[in-house]
């Protein structure tokens, strides 16, 4: 593996080394012109080959962690794990990230199995990046595939993210609170109308921070808040690992009609985009991407992995809903306060009767929002629900899978 060169198979001529570099830069430039920032997936935690790797051939035994018996540690689940805590591996990672920023103008980095790396290295990367551009995004998977050969309290795991300011991790609490356990695809949760996941969803709504109305003893994977700030949590329901959203809904609700799948798809992403963390969408979800039930599709053909863009027409309603969700979040800072104290002050969960119903209020022009009070309610029941809200006249902007900021009518509280 060469971490500092684009892969040639994506270029128009893989046999001309300069072509991949030029075309990658042209791609980044074109995306920037379109107002899109570019985030790279960085897999420093392991290499495909150990003995023949550049690391091992440079200094044998140095760049990889070993067990006490001398065999390779395997926290990555891929045969080895790199030793990020060792000075030269740490130096390599920092300089590699800076190279991609300065040479290719990359805007962010997603660290694969970040839990294999040590906290100090991740913090040093954040500090080095801040000197160039503090707006560059750094986030990763706050877990490992197996147990790394390094003290758990020193690893960049989800539970240690409070020690990594400016670094975010994925929230599997919110994901599985909505969709069900990732390893039990037939088992649903909030979206499927299964009671008991409400607190896990609330945990995600506030951005995994401490909040007086979130009881962590009822949250699926975390018994305490792990984020100091809501910007340290990635809100999502699906990514390239595991089933895409449509396949997950079909697996947990095999009797669902196409119309129900559309409504649940919209409901899921509405939770994501009105939560205080950083929203994340898997490519193609906006057109209801379907991978034919294949979860781990890294070795599947294009017939499974390709995005069928004809779905943009057949599922145009869903596409426009996603677009309007994004516009809604961008237009209203109440949904992205970015500060834990503001969230605790302005986000208030409303009392509801029964389960499979969650409602909250963003009050008092939260984060300088033009709207004084915003009421958000999620109902995954098969029937309408009654909700008591503070006295007032409210303009409805999102209802029954339709968004229109001009208003869909009014309600009196």
Task: Please state what every model-predicted region is.
Residues 3, 31, 41, 100, ...:
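Conserved, mostly hydrophobic/aromatic
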């Amino acid at each position: 593996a060469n971490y500092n060169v684009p892969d040639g198979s994506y270029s128009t001529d893989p046999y001309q080394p300069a072509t991949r570099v030029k075309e990658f830069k042209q791609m980044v430039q074109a995306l920037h012109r379109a107002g899109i920032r570019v985030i790279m997936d960085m897999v420093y935690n392991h290499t495909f080959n150990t003995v023949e790797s550049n690391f091992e051939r440079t200094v044998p035994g140095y760049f990889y962690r070993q067990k006490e018996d001398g065999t390779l540690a395997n926290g990555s689940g891929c045969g080895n794990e790199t030793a990020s805590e060792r000075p030269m591996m740490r130096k390599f990672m920092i300089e590699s990230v800076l190279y991609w920023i300065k040479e290719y103008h990359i805007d962010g980095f997603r660290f694969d199995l970040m839990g294999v790396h040590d906290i100090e290295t991740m913090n040093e990367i954040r500090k080095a990046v801040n000197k160039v551009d503090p707006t560059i995004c750094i986030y990763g998977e706050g877990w490992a595939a197996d147990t790394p050969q390094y003290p758990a309290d020193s690893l960049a795991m989800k539970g240690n993210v409070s020690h990594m300011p400016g670094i975010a991790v994925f929230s599997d609490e919110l994901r599985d609170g909505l969709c069900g356990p990732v390893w039990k695809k037939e088992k649903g949760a909030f979206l499927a109308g299964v009671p008991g996941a409400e607190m896990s969803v609330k945990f995600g709504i506030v951005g995994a921070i401490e909040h007086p109305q979130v009881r962590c003893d009822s949250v699926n994977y975390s018994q305490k808040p792990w984020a100091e700030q809501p910007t340290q949590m990635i809100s999502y329901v699906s990514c390239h690992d595991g089933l895409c959203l449509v396949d997950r809904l079909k697996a947990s609700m095999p009797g669902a009609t196409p119309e129900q799948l559309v409504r649940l798809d919209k409901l899921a992403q509405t939770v994501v985009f009105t939560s205080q963390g950083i929203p994340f969408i898997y490519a193609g979800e906006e057109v209801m991407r379907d991978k034919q039930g294949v979860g781990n599709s890294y070795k599947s053909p294009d017939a499974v992995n390709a995005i069928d863009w004809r779905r943009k027409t057949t599922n145009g309603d869903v596409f426009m809903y996603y677009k309007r969700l994004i516009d809604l979040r961008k237009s209203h800072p109440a949904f992205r306060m970015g500060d834990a104290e503001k969230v605790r002050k302005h986000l208030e969960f409303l009392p509801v009767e029964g389960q499979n119903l969650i409602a909250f209020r963003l009050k008092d022009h939260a984060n300088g929002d033009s709207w004084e009070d915003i009421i958000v309610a999620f109902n995954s029941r098969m029937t309408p629900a009654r909700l008591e809200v503070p006295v007032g006249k409210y303009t409805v902007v999102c209802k029954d899978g339709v968004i229109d900021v001009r208003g869909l009518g009014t309600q009196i509280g």
